[in-house]
Amino acid sequence: MNKTMQAILQALSYGGIEVEAARWIADLKKLDPLRIFVKKLDIDIYNNEYKVPVRLYFADEASMESGNENVPVILFFHGGGWTTESVETYDRVCSRMAQSIGQLVVSVEYRLAPEHRFPVGFEDCYAAAKALFAGELLPRIRPEQITVMGDSAGGNLAAAVCMKARDTGDFRPQRQILIYPALSNCYTEDSPYESVRTNGTGYLLTSEKMADYLELYESKPEDRKNPYFAPLCAEDYTNLPDTLILTAEFDPLRDEGEEYGRRMRQAGCRVRIERIEGALHGYFALGIQHLYVQESFRHINRFLSVERALNEQRL
C-alpha cells in the first residue's frame, strides 16, 4: 500500500461510534445510482410475536418461475456492527450475490442495537434460519441446499446461528460462509489477536470502533462470555458446518477469523481459510469491478462447487 493511500486512510480512520450519524451515512446507499435490478420479493417470518422482514433475491427469471423448487439458497445476515445497515442498504450486495453465485439469496432485516441489544438481533436471525430450514419460508427448498452466510457482524450472527443449531438440534446447516467475521469479545490492547493492534488504526475500521460496537450490542457484561455473542468463547468446535472463511489483510478482525477456522479444523470440521491480500474490512460491499470482490466470488463459487459434489455423494 503506497504512502498516499495510507495517509488518506489514516485521516478517515477516526475512533468511536455515533450511531445516528453512522446510520445516516449508511442510508445514503439507498440512493445507489448503480443499483442492480433483479427479481425480488419481500415477506415476513415470525420471531414469536415480532415480524422479521426478509427479502428474497432471485438469480434470474427462471428461478423465480420455478416456484423455488430445488433452488440452492444463501441465507444472508448483513454487517454493520450490529447497530447500522439494513436489507435496503445491502440491496446491491445481495443482488450482485444472486447474480454472481446463481443462487436465491434470503436477506434478513434483524433488529439493531442499541435499541435492541443482544440477544434480540441474534434471535431474529435464528428464527429466520429455523423457518427456512423447516420449510416454513420456502416449502420446496431442501435443507441441504441452504448455505448460511454473513459479513462482519453478520458473520458473527451466521457463526452463532450455526453453533446454536448444533447445540439445540433444531436444524443442521451443512455449510457456512463467514466474510471477515467479528468473533471475539475484546478489542483493547489485551486482545490475544495481533491484528487488533497492527491493523487497529489507520485502516477505516478501528479497534476503538469495534470496542464501541460491542458495548452497544451487549445487554450486560456477562454476555461477552456467551458463545452466541462471541463464538470464539465456545469450548466446543465439533460438528459445525463445512466452512469458508474470508479475511482481509488490513483488518483488525483478520486474526480472529483465521483462528476460528483453525479451531474448527482442529475439531475435525472441513474448513477453508482464504486471506484477501491488500484488502480492508468492508471490501465485500464494493462493486464487482473491484479485484478483491472478484477474488472473493471465485473462492465462494469454488467452495460451493465442492460442496455440491459432496452433497451429491451424501445423497
Predicted regions and their residues:
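An N-terminal hydrophobic leader/cap segment in hydrolases
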Residues: 1-44
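Alpha/beta-hydrolase superfamily serine-hydrolase fold, recognizing
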Residues: 30, 37-44, 49-315
